[in-house]
Amino acid sequence: MRFRIYKRKVLILTLVVAACGFVLWSSNGRQRKNEALAPPLLDAEPARGAGGRGGDHPSVAVGIRRVSNVSAASLVPAVPQPEADNLTLRYRSLVYQLNFDQTLRNVDKAGTWAPRELVLVVQVHNRPEYLRLLLDSLRKAQGIDNVLVIFSHDFWSTEINQLIAGVNFCPVLQVFFPFSIQLYPNEFPGSDPRDCPRDLPKNAALKLGCINAEYPDSFGHYREAKFSQTKHHWWWKLHFVWERVKILRDYAGLILFLEEDHYLAPDFYHVFKKMWKLKQQECPECDVLSLGTYSASRSFYGMADKVDVKTWKSTEHNMGLALTRNAYQKLIECTDTFCTYDDYNWDWTLQYLTVSCLPKFWKVLVPQIPRIFHAGDCGMHHKKTCRPSTQSAQIESLLNNNKQYMFPETLTISEKFTVVAISPPRKNGGWGDIRDHELCKSYRRLQ
């Protein structure tokens, strides 16, 4: 039997097959690209509060599920599964890409929009219940639609990202600390299984041969990654927002530093603008601004329109700390001192800088009635049960009972206290490891 071959039909059939193949290839390619950049799945995230100390890797590893027959007390944890390694690499790649892209949301024209006299930077870890309260307070703040809010994260969380995705009342930018425990679960700056246990004496550590045996802190303890991370994040964030955030390249205003468990009064921006004007006109020697102290009077009468000039103290004025670019540049010149001082608290370390490295003691302009409150009565320094709803209810009650005194028409400096010498604070330790020192100092060199 003879078959007649029609060249035209063969050509058409070939083109059809090629077209189908191209469509299939393109679809798979897009899928692979989307999978590569997509956020990690919810079930890959650890339970909140799963922290660990020292070399107890299984409790701090993010995205790695503990196998049932693996003991958390093992001196050398099991080798991570390849899927876990791939997940960690996806986190790192995603963080790098987002920090590079710096996608600005809630602005009409991203290429032409510029921030005004205030930018907020919020340090976020993994307490969505408190972050939700902060966002609620921001939503109620008058004039917030003109304020850029930068959220700086050290933990990738779908729940937290969804909370921030719901912010539609102000410009928003998210950045991510690229050296978090989550991104380095099995190695420094996370907890390396070869690290020395926290309470191991130095002579025993030297015999054991753990990798940081030479570098205990001032109290003989070895580093705990979960405590070191906060100071790292704060210093990286300080540098990154001033030097690497493109929208702030020519910014001449102030940056107000917050944390996820802070709560702002509805008139905080109103008061802040008046404080900034007062500083320029009546207190040019003031180095920094603060939105308030931890002590709040039950009545705002006679004080809501008053501010004081004082010597800055880390235990009183670390909430709502606002810096100019000039103040930042003086701080960054003290990088070596900040990064080697043996205290895991960023604010106590700043206090040490004011007496050891900065040209003079910091002078702070602060309102007599706080416009910022600490909702987080639990956390790193507290062992209380977290009750964010109780705390927010108390703050709301205080504000509602004094709303007639808020939004003052003018602010006046009630008193300029004499700037007194402050003794160097007693260091708390937790920052003796030379690896922490060198990583901290490297942030200035990062592009």
UniProtKB/Swiss-Prot annotation:
Residues 1-9 are cytoplasmic. Its cofactor is Mn(2+). Glycans are attached at N69, N86. The keyword Glycoprotein applies. Changing N318A: Strongly decreased catalytic activity and affinity for UDP-GlcNAc. It catalyses: an N(4)-{beta-D-GlcNAc-(1->2)-alpha-D-Man-(1->3)-[alpha-D-Man-(1->6)]-beta-D-Man-(1->4)-beta-D-GlcNAc-(1->4)-beta-D-GlcNAc}-L-asparaginyl-[protein] + UDP-N-acetyl-alpha-D-glucosamine = N(4)-{beta-D-GlcNAc-(1->2)-alpha-D-Man-(1->3)-[beta-D-GlcNAc-(1->2)-alpha-D-Man-(1->6)]-beta-D-Man-(1->4)-beta-D-GlcNAc-(1->4)-beta-D-GlcNAc}-L-asparaginyl-[protein] + UDP + H(+). Changing Y344A: Nearly abolishes catalytic activity and strongly decreases affinity for UDP-GlcNAc. It comes from the Eukaryota. Keywords: Congenital disorder of glycosylation, Disease variant, Disulfide bond, Glycoprotein, Glycosyltransferase, Golgi apparatus, Manganese, Membrane, Metal-binding, Signal-anchor, Transferase, Transmembrane, Transmembrane helix. The chain crosses the membrane at residues 10-29. Mn(2+) binds at D261, H374. InterPro entries: GlcNAc_II (IPR007754), Nucleotide-diphossugar_trans (IPR029044). Pathway: Protein modification; protein glycosylation. It is linked to Congenital disorder of glycosylation 2A: A multisystem disorder caused by a defect in glycoprotein biosynthesis and characterized by under-glycosylated serum glycoproteins. Congenital disorders of glycosylation result in a wide variety of clinical features, such as defects in the nervous system development, psychomotor retardation, dysmorphic features, hypotonia, coagulation disorders, and immunodeficiency. The broad spectrum of features reflects the critical role of N-glycoproteins during embryonic development, differentiation, and maintenance of cell functions. Plays an essential role in protein N-glycosylation. Catalyzes the transfer of N-acetylglucosamine (GlcNAc) onto the free terminal mannose moiety in the core structure of the nascent N-linked glycan chain, giving rise to the second branch in complex glycans. Belongs to the glycosyltransferase 16 (GT16) protein family. Homodimer. This is Alpha-1,6-mannosyl-glycoprotein 2-beta-N-acetylglucosaminyltransferase. It comes from Homo sapiens.
